[in-house]
């Protein structure tokens, strides 16, 4: 099963969400997970290498790769039915290397925030994705939501995105998210992360 984490807008929280989901699938569900870091900043791969210096056996592997390399490495990543491959995509849409990745996706998770630019980028990402892979399920994760801010567009945004896919419970804006690693999710944010992921696990993970 190939799961993409993506949005056209950089800084949407793709890499952190990828780590949160990987930790959830391994620690909560006991699944076999491999993370492929295709983001240009390679922040997930860098965290993985740093954590290996401090911890013992890693709970899952992280592989740094480019979009162009995907057709060559796909068969090695998905070597058995129960294998979960999480791909952290670059924050862009103008690369033909995305086509093969989009075509292979079984599920796409899209973090977004409640501002106009993020919403427009999220819609554009979704439209392009669906032109390439019309049947792939989409899951939208409201990210970095501030508790003391009234988002006037929230209801409208949720309604529009719900026409395209599932909108999960929101992830709050907390400093603890900066401490997520390839080995653990901080306890302070673990419940909210689990709540978001449980909202779509049963429907989309037919393992």
List each language-model region with its residue ranges.
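Walker A/P-loop phosphate-binding motif and the immediately C-terminal alpha-helix
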Residues: 2-37
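Structural beta-sheet core signal
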Residues: 34-35, 87, 110, 140-142
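Nucleotide-state-sensitive switch-loop elements of NTP-binding domains
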Residues: 39-83
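Switch II (G3) loop of P-loop NTPases
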Residues: 78-98
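Inter-motif core of Ras-like GTPase G domains
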Residues: 96-116
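Conserved C-terminal guanine-recognition region of P-loop GTPase G domains, centered on the G4
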Residues: 120-138
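Beta-strand-loop-alpha "switch" segments that mediate conformational coupling across diverse proteins
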Residues: 144-149, 155-187
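NTP-binding/hydrolysis catalytic cores, primarily Walker-type P-loop NTPases
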Residues: 185-207
């Amino acid at each position: 099963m190939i799961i993409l984490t993506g949005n056209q807008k950089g800084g949407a929280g793709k890499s952190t969400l990828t780590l949160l989901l990987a930790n959830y699938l391994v620690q909560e569900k006991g699944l076999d997970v491999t993370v492929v870091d295709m983001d240009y900043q390679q922040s997930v791969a860098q965290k993985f290498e740093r954590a290996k210096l401090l911890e013992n056996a890693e709970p899952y592997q992280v592989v740094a790769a480019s979009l162009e390399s995907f057709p060559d490495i796909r068969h090695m990543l998905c070597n058995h039915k129960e294998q979960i491959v999480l791909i952290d995509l670059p924050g862009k849409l103008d690369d033909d290397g995305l086509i093969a990745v989009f075509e292979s996706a079984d599920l796409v998770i899209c973090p977004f925030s409640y501002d106009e630019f993020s919403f427009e980028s999220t819609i554009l990402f979704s439209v392009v994705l669906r032109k390439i892979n019309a049947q792939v399920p989409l899951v939208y994760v409201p990210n970095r939501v501030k508790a003391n801010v009234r988002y006037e567009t929230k209801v409208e945004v949720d309604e529009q995105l719900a026409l395209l896919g599932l909108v999960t419970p929101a992830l709050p804006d907390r400093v603890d998210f900066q401490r997520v690693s390839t080995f653990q999710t901080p306890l302070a944010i673990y419940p909210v992360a689990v709540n978001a992921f449980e909202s779509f696990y049963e429907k989309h993970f037919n393992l």
